[in-house]
């Protein structure tokens, strides 16, 4: 079956890696849709515009990227959509291409697939992320009646599932918990798969290749030493949980 990639990308020095890995993406996806902020540089825009079967969507507001990428992906000729935060996807393709390809083969088997992180992948993140996201996952697991990690930034959609999300939400918000709850409430099955490849990607920024485990660990310690990062991650966890609870109890469908 045909699978379209939908992703959000805020470029932070990944250009060389994208140029190196883009051919692999084109081989596996029928089409590629990337939403980028209006601050995206000329070099990144030019590269995306020159690639075949690749659509770039410039987002007018912060937080709109996921929705707009999914919306544009629905215009492509594909049976299923793989959404993935693009910096995470580059890390995954570079560090574990076999697992990535195996996961793509699994997506058409499900109506909605949450692609989460193994414990190993989660532990590669700063503790300010790992600990606050465990709280989100506890809530998500309870609401969805199965153990899940919703913080991996990756989902598999049937066209029906994607249309449910687009119909019942508007641009803005996170979607991490909201989207699977809406799909589940609509009567579609929500499945789960944990992978190693969705390890912490932010340590890759401005590097020629993905960070090693040691480089990830050092960057994570530095990140955690800034108390404002902890405060921000607590705020994000609260927003994601509130958004999910609102969806669960049929309140607002567009948060933030």
Give the location of each predicted region.
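Short, well-formed alpha-helical segments that are part of the catalytic scaffolds
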Residues: 7-28, 39-42
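Conserved donor nucleotide-binding strand/loop of the catalytic core
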Residues: 49-64
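Active-site nucleotide-sugar/metal-binding loop of Leloir-type enzymes
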Residues: 67-80
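Short beta-strand-to-loop acidic/aromatic patch adjacent to the donor-nucleotide binding site
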Residues: 78-91
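Conserved donor-nucleotide/metal-binding helix-loop-beta segment in metal-dependent transferases, i.e.
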Residues: 89-122
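Short, flexible, basic/aromatic active-site loop/helix in glycosyltransferases
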Residues: 109-151
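Conserved nucleotide-sugar donor-binding
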Residues: 136-137, 150-166
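C-terminal catalytic/acceptor-binding lobe
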Residues: 173, 177-180, 184-256
